[in-house]
Design a protein with these regions (language model features):
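Conserved hydrolase catalytic core segment
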Residues: 5-48
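Active-site helix-initiating loop/hinge in glycosyltransferases
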Residues: 101, 140-143, 170
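Conserved alpha/beta-hydrolase catalytic His-Asp/Glu region
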Residues: 45-53, 63-123
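Alpha/beta-hydrolase active-site loop
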Residues: 1-3
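Short alpha-helix in the alpha/beta-hydrolase fold that links the catalytic acid
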Residues: 126, 140-149
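Short beta-strand/loop motif that positions the catalytic acidic residue
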Residues: 124, 130-132
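Catalytic active-site module of serine/aspartate enzymes centered on a nucleophile-bearing elbow/loop
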Residues: 154-186
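Acidic catalytic loop of the alpha/beta-hydrolase fold
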Residues: 134-139
Length: 186
């Protein structure tokens, strides 16, 4: 509805993590809106055995706020060497996590924990690029390989020395993969 309201007839969707989950959902519901789809560090399904982890995060945010979630999230989102080096990127993300409203975080956790699109994504016909950090724990390479197998003609790029925020850990390699893909479709 937003794209239509803005008068945007078609778009190149680039979605990271939950943004990739949203992109898959929208591409299934309104395929005519997509010139291409880039799915970054995301998944088409969260396994049922992961639900208790998501429930625990919800409980923590409800009862203690965001602070207790900060360091664990950073450890999942960045490789250990990158996190240890710290720097402005890690500090910026640390601040973003701290300033996330718990209610918004809880809603996202609940949406993510119920995701199950794998059996439907073969219907995605838009040219699709899948990018994943080789060390992504939350949406691992195996999940990207499933999407790559199911979405006909999709391309898979695995970035070395990167976890869940591969765009931040390996910005040059990420941007090269992204612009190379989009450059052929603009």
């Amino acid at each position: 509805a937003l794209l239509r309201a803005l008068g945007i007839p078609r778009t190149h969707w680039v979605g990271l993590s939950m943004g990739g989950m949203i992109g898959q959902t929208l591409a299934l519901k309104a395929p005519e809106l997509f010139s291409s789809l880039v799915l970054c560090d995301t998944s088409s399904r969260i396994p049922p055995e992961a639900k208790p982890l998501w429930d625990e995060r919800v409980h923590t945010a409800e009862t203690k706020g965001m602070e207790p979630l900060v360091e664990g999230t950073l450890s999942r989102w960045f490789t250990a060497p990158f996190k240890e080096r710290g720097g402005a990127v890690v500090e910026t993300v640390r601040g973003m996590i701290r300033s996330t409203p718990p209610a918004g975080y809880i809603g996202c956790c609940q949406a993510i924990s119920g995701l199950n699109l794998t059996d439907r994504i073969s219907a995605i016909k838009a040219p699709t690029l899948i990018i994943v950090g080789e060390d992504d724990q939350g949406t691992p390479v195996a999940a990207s390989k499933v999407m790559n197998e199911r979405i006909q003609g999709s391309q898979l790029v695995i970035l070395k020395s990167a976890a869940h925020l591969s765009n931040m850990e390996q910005p040059d390699a990420f941007t090269s993969a992204l612009t190379g893909f989009l450059g052929k479709r603009s």
